[in-house]
Amino acid sequence: MPHGHLRQALSPTSWTCEGLLLLLGLLVLFFHHHNQSAVERRRRVSFVEADRLPHESGWYSSDDDGDRDGDEETGESHNRNSVGLSAVFS
């Protein structure tokens, strides 16, 4: 049987303690290297540039005065989310 050695190598009972520790060490080294390369990539791009929302986004108002029902003087509604929700539910 030519594949007997392969079957024996893949059997969990044939691994020695040293072999398991070696495999564990290699996995730790691999994940450490992968983590360090991901950290270096994140340092090249600042979080401000990557996560910045546009100032005129419809999800918040820069002049938020706590009046969510609207402005009685101008008839203007400050709750911009209601437009998006009405589009979703209609």
From Swiss-Prot:
Claim: Nucleotide-binding is one of the keywords in the record: no
GO CC field: host cell membrane; membrane
Biased composition (Polar residues): 80-90
Localisation per UniProt entry: Host membrane
Membrane topology: Single-pass membrane protein
Key words, A-Z: Host membrane, Membrane, Transmembrane, Transmembrane helix
Biased composition (Acidic residues): 62-74
Name this protein carries in UniProt: Protein RL8A
Organism: Human cytomegalovirus (strain Merlin)
